[in-house]
Curated annotation (Swiss-Prot):
Keywords for this protein: Disulfide bond, Glycoprotein, Secreted
GO biological process: arachidonate secretion; lipid catabolic process; phosphatidylcholine metabolic process; phosphatidylglycerol metabolic process
Organism: Xenopus laevis (African clawed frog)
Designated name of the protein: Phospholipase A2 homolog otoconin-22
Subunit record text: Monomer.
PROSITE patterns for this protein: PA2_ASP
Gene3D superfamilies per record: Phospholipase A2 domain
GO terms for cellular component: extracellular region
Pfam families, per the entry: Phospholip_A2_1 (PF00068)
Keyword Glycoprotein attached: yes
Length: 127
């Protein structure tokens, strides 16, 4: 669920939550067009692709719950899933949260609410 993804982000980045990434660049949040603006935006593009694959399998990223734990160095990992959808959605969120952690130095306040500036145009990269 988005609430669980928010927890993952808070654990991995320490200072940020889902709100900091919900309208960042051209691919974080509801907007999915144009080229990603930086490595964090690429994290979101990858998560979008992952969610699309899960949705094509009948899974719902908004309602699917899952369990995860925190490893050393603030890395999150999914726990053993009870079904395919739980596994797929958790892994999508796990990869994105760990990607945010890895690319946190790239976070640029300029790219918050960026899509509202009309800068995200053109085709999006393939998955």
């Amino acid at each position: 669920t988005p609430a669980q993804f928010d927890e993952m982000i808070k654990v991995t980045t320490i200072i940020y939550g889902l709100a900091n990434f919900s309208d960042y660049g051209c691919h974080c949040g509801l907007n999915n067009q144009g080229m990603p603006v930086d490595d964090i935006d690429w994290c979101c593009h990858s998560q979008d692709c992952c969610y699309n694959k899960a949705e094509m399998s009948g899974c719902n990223p908004v309602t699917q719950t899952y369990r995860f734990y925190v490893e050393e160095q603030k890395k999150v990992e999914c726990m053993k899933a009870s079904n395919r959808c739980e596994k797929m959605i958790c892994e999508c969120d796990e990869k994105a949260a760990n990607c945010f952690r890895k690319e946190l130095e790239d976070y640029n306040i300029y790219f918050r609410n960026f899509s509202s500036l009309g800068a995200c145009r053109g085709p999006r990269p393939f998955c």
